[in-house]
């Protein structure tokens, strides 16, 4: 088999493989699009189920909240009859409660009353008569206007007749100086000059001093000192470091017991708030946790379906 035949066969096989790869890519792309559309549809259905469940929980929570608020009011009325101590006054307001659920849509209003009839229209002209302009007599002439701008320059006139017998005129003034000429050739070298007179020998100023020489060798030791008396005392040395801290001292004697204090005044505590706000917070948090748990379960189901679909596609 020749090389040309082998190359042509390999090129044909390569083209078939590339064509098959393109077809498989197109199928995979279409499968991915269908999977994404199915996922969006399932997510929309799940969102609808979640909204319905949330609305049902909100409505149920509203009924429970109303019943608890009624019971709380009765309990508060019963507790208000207790005369346990001095009632508090000027107590600060508690924290604001959570926003309530949105109310139902109101009913449509009744149609308004009919308007009053309008005023009768005004009739327009039936026909139009053509009128001629009034002819006025001619008036007096107006004042003279401002002088106009000078006109443009006229053309040159014709040349005059030639002069007759005037003679030669006087000479004109001298003309300007001409430009410099080109440089001339170099001249011949001159003769050598006569020798000059001998000069007087000068004497310059002394130069600066040189650098100091190297240090010489040490000298011989000196003679021993006279007398056996000690020399004078030297200057005092620097202060030494601080010493170690000493041992702690013994404890003192206990003091005498103090006198009894006077009884304090009434604290005037504020009354406890109703339990409706606390229970409302707990119910809302519990419902939110349940809804978030349902969302997580639904997301896990969708992810599991995606994995199963991908495995089926790979096996196919």
Curated annotation (Swiss-Prot):
The organism's place on the tree of life at top rank: Eukaryota
Ranges annotated as biased composition (Low complexity): 110-125, 137-147, 177-198, 241-260
Sequence ranges of Polar residues compositional bias: 79-90
Ranges for region Disordered: 78-269, 281-316
Regions of compositional bias (Pro residues) in chain numbering: 209-221
Name of a matching Pfam family: Col_cuticle_N
Coiled-coil stretches: none
Keyword Flavoprotein: no
Chain intervals for the UniProt region annotation (Triple-helical region): 94-126, 139-198, 204-263
Signal peptide range in chain numbering: 1-34
InterPro entries (UniProt xref): Col_cuticle_N
GO molecular function annotation: structural constituent of cuticle
Keywords, in A-Z order: Collagen, Cuticle, Disulfide bond, Repeat, Signal
GO cellular component: collagen trimer
Keyword Disulfide bond: yes
Function: Nematode cuticles are composed largely of collagen-like proteins. The cuticle functions both as an exoskeleton and as a barrier to protect the worm from its environment.
Family affiliation: Belongs to the cuticular collagen family.
Assembly and oligomerization: Collagen polypeptide chains are complexed within the cuticle by disulfide bonds and other types of covalent cross-links.
Identification of the protein by name: Cuticle collagen 7
Species, as recorded: Caenorhabditis elegans
